[in-house]
């Protein structure tokens, strides 16, 4: 998973730069796909875990969000989203469709090997026996990947221990930094109002506004 560099603020209020890095060594393929889908769609963890293969439109490179996983009384449950705007369709790059197809084939082969012991319901992200991936797994996998990346690197070159939700924040920040309109970003995130997006990503909008100012300066300076 490669991510271009832009600055954002993590959940502790500490600013950091999303550098140009890779974290793929010794990682399960479905975890790689999970991380990529989180970055390229901005879906919440619960929305990702609730995805079934029927939610993927391979022809048009789209993912349909219609449910989410959460913890209720200590139990992992899948239910409808809290708001109408959480029901949405989000596009992703074509290379990711190919990765998803390969993962689907691998899981079908595993299902055949398990036979009657398979307990899955067509979930995309699964445990060994086909059951839905545990709610804690995405966070644990990301922390493990960050730790392995940081091993042997000096502090200034290390990645911060961001939560899994940080991938969603990174997705939005990169879109805003690339001058995507706030309505599009808000729709992809499933926010009820654009004001929610603007409040959460004020730091990225300020950076984007500064870049716009610099562009105007360079354009008008040529006319002076």
PLM regions with names:
Residues 2-31, 41, 90, 106-116, ...:
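Short, basic (Lys/Arg/His-rich) helix/loop patches that form interaction surfaces
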